[in-house]
Amino acid sequence: IFDEKSADGIVGAVDLEQYDYRKGSGSAVRATEATVAERIPPRLKVRRGAPLELPHIMILIDDPQKTVIEKVSAKKASLKKLYDFTLMKNGGSIKGYLMDGETVAETDSALAALGNSEEFEKKYGKGTPVLLYAMGDGNHSLATAKEYYEELKRENPDKDFSNHPARYALA
């Protein structure tokens, strides 16, 4: 939902195991434009020493039936409000709500349906890999997060990274 006065969305974690920014990628999470590899090393240098990372990543979904974001937005009144404040410099205001277990399950189910390969192929052609999450903004930030995560795995081959915080990026 977007107009001049409001924009609804979902803040969540992206599994970097599902992301590939390289040209020709068929991963479920991928870039919509070329990633300039030369931009990654300077960002990676900053990321290595950062006590906190606050990325600006916007991911888009193709959801013409409005089964994901709009369904969550319709439930706002029943969700716990986490924050509600005015932004500086006439930036408007922002509110955030905590999705309850039922809403998370419904959202996961709706996203899984969007990732159905048969439905995706009907729309985009046979053999087209499902693009569930398209990078809208912050592609280089996400690519840097991916490189940092891959670097950690290379440096610690015996470590279990299945639940490591570096495996996920805020988007």
Task: Please place each PLM-identified region on the residue numbering.
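N-terminal extension/subdomain marker
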Residues: 1-91, 119-123
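A short alpha->loop->secondary-structure connector
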Residues: 77, 153-161
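Glycine-rich phosphate-binding "P-loop"
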Residues: 88-109
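Short, contiguous, pocket-lining structural segments
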Residues: 51, 99, 103, 133-140
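Class I SAM-dependent methyltransferase SAM-binding "motif I" and its flanking Rossmann-like core
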Residues: 159-171
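Short, well-ordered loop/turn elements at secondary-structure boundaries
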Residues: 52-55, 127-131, 164-167
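A structural signal for short, well-ordered beta-strand segments and their strand-loop junctions
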Residues: 58-60, 134-136, 170
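Active-site beta-strand/loop microenvironment that shapes enzyme catalytic pockets
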Residues: 113-155
